C-alpha cells in the first residue's frame, strides 16, 4: 500500500490499483465462497480464500510505467519504513494552504484520513487553519510521528483509536476519539468548533 492506494502485483508485471474511497469495501472469505454481495468490481481467488472488492473509487490495471507514474505522484506514506518525511515538509513549508488541508493531500503526505486529521492536530495543539509556511520543522516532526503512531495502532486493531487506553473492541468510534464529531474538549471542557476544509468536516478546540 501507498497511503490509501492498494496495489496488487502480478507475475505478468501488471498491477491492480485500488482506491476504496469513502464507500469501498474489501471482503475476505474462505472457499468455497458464499454468493457475492453487492456489485463486485474485482474478485481475487487463491487456494483457500478469496477477496471481493466492492465499490472502490478507483479500480484499474496498470502496466509498469503507469505504476511508477502513480507512485511518483503520491507523497511519503507515514506507515512505510522507506518514507522520507522531508519531502512532505518541503511542500508544507512553501504552502499558504492550511495544514488541515495539506496533511490530507495525498500528494503531500499519504495515509491520513478525515478523522485522523482533526485528532492529530488537536493532540499536537496545531490549529487546522494554520498556513503550511508557519509550521516549523519541530512541529511537523511531532505531527508526522503522532500520525505514524496512531495509524500503526489503527492497523494493529483494525480501528481508529486516538484516545490513550481506549479499547479497540468498542463499536462506537466516539469512545475512541478525542474531539471528532464531539461537542466538548476532553482537556479544557471548552466547546469544540466544527467547520469545513475542502468540503470535509474538521473539528478544533480554540481555547
Which positions does each model-derived feature cover?
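Structured catalytic/nucleic-acid-binding cores of DNA maintenance enzymes
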Residues: 1-207
